[in-house]
């Protein structure tokens, strides 16, 4: 919501389902805006994984996905919750700072692109780092850019049986003036009920 209220829209079952997708990913990609607004952990709650996922990732060999945070203005601080969790964290920045960071946190410097991080360059870097499965949990700005740039292979949406009205935050920002005829087009890959909620898995239609 625009007033900052965000916990919880979906059910416990839906949130547990998200853990499965996180566990199967090499990277969880987000932005400093999400860190500042929600102060999330963005980690895998291993004990909440279903039996099938646990059988794939036994505790002895399980590794948390790398949390990659786009932070062009160095807004993420050592005091944020995500920094206090286990697992690697990469802060993608235009310049490093001299603050004391834990060993699991690395500042990675990207080239300045109009005072912003070049997302295409970042994704290329991830690919060169042999990372090929990126799970994105972000706000409307980053999500909108990725969708508008056709950089998404799958879109996963959890829908709760609630109506929030015009004060709800948008899923993504689309800055072009769209008509129905040139809207972003998707096709359904899977629809299923998760507890009281619905999970949609969509893939973009080829241009």
UniProtKB/Swiss-Prot annotation:
Gene Ontology molecular function: any one: NADP binding
Binding-site residues for NADP(+), renumbered to this chain: 8, 38, 72
EC number(s) per entry: 1.1.1.193
Top-level class of the enzyme under EC nomenclature: oxidoreductase
A Pfam family hit: RibD_C
Record keyword Transmembrane present: no
Annotated catalysed reactions: 5-amino-6-(5-phospho-D-ribitylamino)uracil + NADP(+) = 5-amino-6-(5-phospho-D-ribosylamino)uracil + NADPH + H(+)
Recorded metabolic or biological pathway in which this protein acts: Cofactor biosynthesis; riboflavin biosynthesis; 5-amino-6-(D-ribitylamino)uracil from GTP: step 3/4
Gene Ontology biological process terms, A to Z: riboflavin biosynthetic process
Record: residues binding substrate: 6, 22, 42, 45, 137
Keyword presence, Isomerase: no
InterPro entries, alphabetized: DHFR-like_dom_sf, Eubact_RibD, RibD_C, RibDG_C, Riboflavin_Biosynth_HTPR
Alphabetical UniProt keywords: NADP, Oxidoreductase, Riboflavin biosynthesis
Family designation: Belongs to the HTP reductase family.
Cross-referenced NCBIfam families: eubact_ribD, ribD_Cterm
Name of this protein: 5-amino-6-(5-phosphoribosylamino)uracil reductase
């Amino acid at each position: 919501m625009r007033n900052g209220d965000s916990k919880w829209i979906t059910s416990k079952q839906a949130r547990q389902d998200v853990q499965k997708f996180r566990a199967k990913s090499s990277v969880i990609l987000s932005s400093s805006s999400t860190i500042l607004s929600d102060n999330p952990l963005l980690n895998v709650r291993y004990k909440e994984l279903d039996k099938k996922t646990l059988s794939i990732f036994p505790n002895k060999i399980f590794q948390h996905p790398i949390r990659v945070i786009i932070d062009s203005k160095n807004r993420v601080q050592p005091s944020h919750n995500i920094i206090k969790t286990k697992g690697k964290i990469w802060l993608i920045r235009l310049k490093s700072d001299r603050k004391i960071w834990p060993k699991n946190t690395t500042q990675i410097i990207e080239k300045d692109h109009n005072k912003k991080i070049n997302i295409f360059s970042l994704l290329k870097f991830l690919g060169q780092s042999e990372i090929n499965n990126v799970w994105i949990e972000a706000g409307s700005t980053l999500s909108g850019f990725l969708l508008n740039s056709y950089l998404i292979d799958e879109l996963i949406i959890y829908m709760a049986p609630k109506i929030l009205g015009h004060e709800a935050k948008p899923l993504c920002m689309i800055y072009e003036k769209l008509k129905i005829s040139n809207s972003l087009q998707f096709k359904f890959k899977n629809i299923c009920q998760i507890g009281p909620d619905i999970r949609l898995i969509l893939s973009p239609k080829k241009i």
